[in-house]
Amino acid sequence: MPTIGVQMMMLRDEVGKAGPYEVLRRLTDAGFRAVEVSQIPMTPENVAEMRRARDELGVDFGALSAAVGPGPNDCLVERFDKIVADCRALDARHVRIGMMPLSALATTEGVVEFCRRTQDIATRLADEGVQLHYHNHHVEFARRGGVTVLDAIRAEAPGMRLEIDVHWVQRGGRDPVRTLQKYAGLVDLVHLKDYRIGELGPGALEAQRSGDREAFLREFAAVVEFGEVGEGNLEWAEIVDQSIASGAEYLLIEQDVLYGRDAFDCLATSREHLVDLGYEKLL
């Protein structure tokens, strides 16, 4: 059975203030035991605190994050050995790429070249006992020549598995449950965040009154929000059950924007909903 955990990107500010160990202690007190690390500097000091949390608190490091270009995570091209060493230090068996560089995503040729590089990296990581994964957003559901970018990634880099983010699947115009079914056996990691429709802002009314149709459409489309699990429109029992059926190992709560709420309060809301649905045994 998979473990429900937390994507630590949403706690990066707290880590910057209090350090990884204290944040991980608060997470375990809040009823979580697994994490995925992203956008947190993997300095020797931070890795040492994470390892301490593993040893003393029993934290399970489900996955670490990396990139193949500039960004907040270590680059697999330039720091391969360090990333492998971090995985060994934390007993992490999965490394995930949050997104390919936008310069690669811009063209079919760029996607193919990205896949060529990541396929080589996936093979090298596999030799070290680590599995590489690609995390989707909505843009990977763009169709080129009748094929989505995500399917092209699978075809061109078969050694790289998938991390399915159900919010971004929905935003990409696909059904999360059917997408998890489609990629069953290829998905070890799933991101849990809701797809919430917020209120129209005052800018929409102002644009309508002024006759600025372009501004109105921008405001009209900007109501999609990143919700706590259970606070939006996704069917969570179906999503979690299909994640289990598809072979996922970690289901990771994430929220890209908190809209002024405290991160731990957001996590508590998501956790409570999953417990109410009967998934406490996965925590």
Predicted regions and their residues:
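Active-site acidic/histidine proton-transfer and metal-coordination neighborhood
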Residues: 25, 41, 60, 72-162, ...
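A short, acidic, amphipathic alpha-helical segment used as a generic capping/interface helix at domain edges
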Residues: 231-244
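N-terminal pre-domain/capping segments
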Residues: 1-93, 130, 161, 272-283
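Acidic-and-aromatic substrate-binding clefts and catalytic sites of carbohydrate-active enzymes
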Residues: 12-18, 34-47, 67-78, 102-106, ...
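Acidic/histidine-rich catalytic cores of soluble enzymes
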Residues: 6, 123-229, 233
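Conserved beta-strand positions in the central sheet of alpha/beta enzyme cores
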Residues: 36, 63, 96, 133, ...
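C-terminal/domain-terminus segments
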Residues: 250-278
